[in-house]
A protein has these predicted regions:
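Accessory beta-strand-rich segments of carbohydrate-active enzymes
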Residues: 1-120, 283, 291-293, 306-309, ...
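Extended acidic/polar, glycine-enriched regions
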Residues: 47-55, 141-232
Length: 765
């Protein structure tokens, strides 16, 4: 501490993240306490500091004794760890059905010393008016923390997406507040991925004293756009509308990227968003059981065009909304997070909670008798509707109305017309059940095992003989979401294998079981996504559970903890493509309806080619259609009558190959199966491959002598990213894969190590 710094009028210790029950001391003197992981804490420390070295000490109390004592006083009905709702700490810290119980404590975000004399910026609110054609009016409200003084000014500079700064605009502050207005001519609008570009403007705000000296400064990157959330009506589904254009939300549910948040890097978070855009996603739902993510993640969403469904951090439990102190704590938490994040164009909607509507009851709380706590009836209690409204409509809704009136807010999910559909995983129904649900599907999913390389990261060789080995089951959490659960992962593993065997044949070994579970997961989610995209606008959103993992595990994810793509992630590139060709087989009349689904904002023209083969690859029929599809439309564009072919060859011996060629990114293909994959008498596809390239970049061409379903490339022991995987290859139609290696290999080394496998290779022969 220098003498000059010590002379400043105000010296504040700023703690941006304390997890969670903390006492802060400076030079041995307590300056304050913290009890909310999500809040920013500032303490006046000027009188305690001295020139030279100073000591800052943060003492943390464990969370478990605290919540257990609160729970002993009054049990809160919950699906998760008893008592966890009493503390403002990330719920999944206490375990979830995809992650471990690691109840952390510590300093998890920056600590800084803030010094100022006259004034500092407290809040900058930016609103947009798109009411005039080819113009956007910006209103920037500035709020400061200041001592009574005259002559303070604010200066604003708007920099365009191409980096050109505009003329400075000034305004004099009155009572520490001021407003600056400016108009953007010929605005460049921000669009979700796949709909247009993501131009970002920078608003720089300088706080000046009467002599023009800089006192404080901040900046915000914004996108010029309008965003609406239309909740479900009797005739229309829930949907998002950007810049006046409705769009189909294609994405997944995001969970914390690590069980220990401080281990996630900006580069990793950015790569996650790049991987979303790479498979044609435009949306991610930031689920309510984690934490408010770092600015770097939202910056990446802004840049890539990923629209965020932003949950406040309340999930799967009742909360003590009858306690004024709890509500005050939440109000401050929400205010700080809304101020920090509301300017991001990627945030499409704020949502009060995840699945707490299932705990909402009548006018009074329904408490669980103490003798039934811990039994099957312990979760049957209800939160009173007045307290639910007090928390999610009045407190959080009030913060949104005050601080972000232009942002969409809904009280909960699935409480706004969206659907969480779990009859397949939890109910054990076949994938066919997905066709019986409609609307905006914001949660649904099925688990798969990780890739062999990830499995090797948490198992010993003796664990890799069976997916039922103790360590392997330990990393499957679906029926033991908290530390006190006793199930060993058997139930979740059984669920995976039940549906795998329903759809596919018996895998031949451990590694084949891992791969086949991923093919099964991709098969089910693709079946669901195709159906919902076909019926647009009856359904306007498909957001599967889940995008990522927070540890190496068996889970619902399409991309694992290490960022390795599973089969589902590769297939998402196809079923989320801007133009989707698909076929729907009707076993009653033996026809295949040919669907063309387009998210493009302009009409699409092209040729739709179809071919029918047997499982030996012999062509039995073919045709070509000239197709024009209107913008943002899905419809049947043709029909194939297979009656005679089914009669002659049997449906289990037929494949229908589809390809729509609209040029460039508008080219898409698909395969229609007339029976479950297990019923197909597949033949050895006789896969072969060649390679060209060098170093870390290669192009691999794969050929099949017989029809090959779900073909994938792998290089055991080598980290690689493939341009595509788990695709279908017909004889005479070789497929090209771009291969990106993390370390260079010679071509001979690559050809020696590379493996090309297919569904056929996973089966016992």
């Amino acid at each position: 501490m220098t003498a000059d710094l010590l002379q400043r009028k105000h010296l504040l210790l700023r703690c941006e993240g304390l997890d969670t029950l903390a006492t802060v001391l400076v030079n041995g003197v307590e300056v304050g306490q913290a009890d909310n992981m999500y809040r920013l804490w500032e303490f006046d420390v000027k009188k305690l500091l001295k020139v030279g070295s100073n000591n800052i000490e943060v003492r943390f109390a464990p969370a478990l004794p605290f919540i257990r004592s609160k729970e002993a006083e009054q049990h809160l009905p919950t699906w998760q760890y008893p008592g966890a709702a009493y503390i403002r700490k990330m719920p999944c810290n206490f375990g979830w059905d995809w992650g471990p119980t690691v109840v952390t404590c510590g300093i998890w975000r920056n600590i800084a010393l803030v010094a100022y004399d006259t004034a500092r910026l407290d809040d900058v609110r930016i609103s947009q008016d798109h009411g005039q054609k080819d113009k956007v009016k910006l209103t920037v409200q500035v709020f400061t923390q200041t001592a009574p003084s005259a002559g303070l000014k604010v200066q604003l500079v708007l920099t365009s997406p191409d980096g050109k700064p505009g003329k400075p605009v000034e305004s004099t502050l009155i009572n520490g507040q001021g407003t600056v207005e400016l108009t953007v001519q010929r605005p460049q609008l921000w669009w979700p991925a796949g709909m247009g570009k993501q131009p970002l403007y920078t608003v720089k705000v300088d706080l000046l004293d009467a002599q023009g000296r800089l006192l404080d400064a901040t900046q915000r990157r914004i996108g010029l756009r309008t965003m609406q959330v239309l909740e479900q009506t009797n005739s229309t589904p829930m949907q998002f509308v950007v810049n006046g254009v409705p769009y189909f939300a294609k994405g997944a549910n995001w969970i914390p990227a690590d069980a220990f948040p401080t281990r996630s890097t900006k580069a990793q978070l950015r790569q996650f968003m790049a991987d979303a855009v790479a498979v044609n996603m435009n949306s991610l739902r930031f689920w309510g059981g984690g934490y408010y993510e770092d600015d770097a993640l939202f910056d990446a969403c802004d840049e890539f065009g990923i629209c965020v469904w932003m949950d406040f951090k309340f999930a799967c439990s009742t909360y003590p909304a009858y306690d004024p102190n709890f509500l005050a704590n939440v109000r401050q938490e929400a205010s700080e997070q809304v101020k920090r994040l509301r300017h991001h164009p990627s945030i499409a909607v704020w949502c009060g909670n995840n699945e707490i509507m299932f705990f909402r009851g009548g006018n009074e709380w329904k408490w669980v008798p103490k003798e039934k706590i811990g039994s099957d009836e312990s979760n049957l209690g209800k939160m009173s509707t007045p307290d639910y409204n007090r928390l999610f409509k009045d407190t959080l809704g009030g913060v949104m109305r005050k601080l972000a009136p232009q942002s969409a807010y809904v009280t909960g999910s699935p409480d706004c017309g969206d659907v969480h559909f779990w009859d397949v995983w939890h109910g054990g129904k076949p994938f066919d059940a997905y066709r019986g649900i409609h609307g905006f599907i914001s949660e649904f999913g099925f688990q798969s095992f990780p890739v062999p390389a990830t499995a090797a990261a948490f198992t010993a060789p003796e664990d890799r003989n069976s997916v039922y080995s103790p360590m392997f089951k330990h990393h499957e959490r679906s029926n033991r979401s908290s530390v006190d659960s006793i199930d060993d992962g058997q139930i979740g593993t059984d669920k995976i294998m039940k549906i795998v065997r329903m759809n596919f044949r018996e895998p031949k070994d451990f590694e084949s079981t891992l791969w086949l579970s991923q093919i099964n997961q991709a098969y089910g989610i693709e079946f669901a996504a195709e159906g919902w995209r076909r019926e647009m606008p009856k359904s306007m959103g498909c957001v599967y559970w889940q995008y990522n993992d927070n540890w190496p595990s068996t889970s619902w994810s399409s991309m694992d903890y290490f960022g390795r793509w599973k089969a589902l992630h590769y297939r998402a590139r196809h079923f989320y493509s801007s133009v989707l060709v698909s076929g729907d087989f009707n076993p009653t009349n033996q026809t295949v309806a040919l669907w063309l689904t387009s998210d493009e904002l302009k009409p699409v023209q092209g040729k739709l080619n179809w071919q029918v083969t047997d499982l030996a690859g012999n062509e039995l029929g073919a045709g070509k259609l000239s197709v024009t599809q209107t913008a943002q439309k899905s419809s049947v564009v043709g029909t194939i009558d297979l009656g005679q072919l089914v009669k002659a060859h049997g449906g289990t011996n037929l494949l229908v190959w589809l390809k729509f060629d609209g040029g460039g990114k508008l080219t898409t293909d698909n395969v229609v199966l007339l029976a479950r994959p297990k019923q197909l008498p597949l033949q050895d596809p006789q896969l072969s491959f060649t390679a060209s390239g060098s170093g870390t970049n290669y192009t691999v061409t794969v050929r099949a002598g017989k029809p090959a379903l779900w073909v994938w490339l792998d290089i055991p022991g080598v980290e690689a990213r493939f341009s595509d995987n788990f695709i279908h290859i017909a004889p005479g139609a070789p497929a090209k894969f771009n291969v990106q290696l993390t370390k260079p290999m010679s071509k001979s080394e690559l050809l020696k190590s590379l493996q090309a496998q297919s569904l056929f290779s996973t089966y016992k022969q």
